[in-house]
Amino acid sequence: MNEPTRLPRIPRRTALLATGAILLMVAACGQAAVTAPTPAPTRAATQAGATLPGAAAGGPAQPGQASAAGPAATAGSSAGGTFPGGFLVADRGNGRLLAIDRTGRIWWRFPTAGAVPASQAFAADDAFLAPDGRTIVANDEAHEVIDRIDIATGRITWQYGHYGRAGSGAGFLHTPDDAYPLANGDIVVADIENCRVIEINPAKQIVRQWGRTGACTAAAPATFGRPNGDTPLPDGGILITEITGSRVVRLAADGHVVFDIHVPVRYPSDAQLDSAGNVIVADYSNPGSVVRVSPTGKLLWRYGPKTGAGRLDHPSLATPLADGTILINDDFRHRLVIVDPATNTIVWQYGTTDRPGQTANHLNVPDGHEPLPAGISF
């Protein structure tokens, strides 16, 4: 995704657990509760306006919605079985990655001392486990870099981009988003302000590009309008989300357009496909929403309460789970929630609503998530 800023920065995924596929995550950026203008600010920019830990106070839960009060309301609900391996979360405002099980227990975290290059800060907005299970790729749009983290050593071992410097030349990125590790060792990323999606190999060479650098018109497949989502698909294709024009484009492995549709949201973020091939996409706004749209552009479902505990504030990623529920990053309410489309209610939550923090059951602008497979261990 991409937003206004809260950290120094700029401007969100179905878990593809199939063999050879990438474990997708979402993540988008988040910042202050600002309605995206035209052109919309990046998510990183939005995040920059987010509240620091402990600075905000929350209101009471409303009838029919999950309580925001504490771990009991977020950790052991019946919805926990929808991600038996727990999930990876990019807790952007706290500058950390967490692996959390379905009971809310944190069983892995990054960074630890010495993990990040000297003089650099870490503020990942997305993170995805590589198919081989040995590394995690983290996207840090605030600092214009992509990091590969070695799980065994807990250190960054590879970085692409020039830290703190945006650009379009060789080795540069401009507001990168959703960096996904591929089975061949490459990484695919949406380079938002360069209006392109690129595939980068381990030698830091661009080996494939969708769109033309600097050409920011929504006219797929030739050009793309500020793409902020680039979800790899099991068939070798890619699902691209465009901020400009609120469009979602599905490309086949050979690059031809399968569909190119307008989605009924103000600021689309990190579109995913559900098991039926429909598009699930978050509206990075306040109040925000999540919609399901058919490949022909027909609205099938919307979740978007305008008030109360169910209201979303800049949701950046919505991932359809195996049981039909939807896992959502609710960035500026500092929580992850699961919504049941059958009842349009929150049935599970991690994070304390409107209360950012670092302690148990607290997050601070969580901007990315990835459901993990059962039995995973770092």
Where are the predicted features?
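Bacterial N-terminal signal peptides that target proteins for export
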Residues: 3-18
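Bacterial signal peptide processing site
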Residues: 30-32
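Histidine-/acidic-rich catalytic cores in large beta-rich domains
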Residues: 54, 59, 70-378
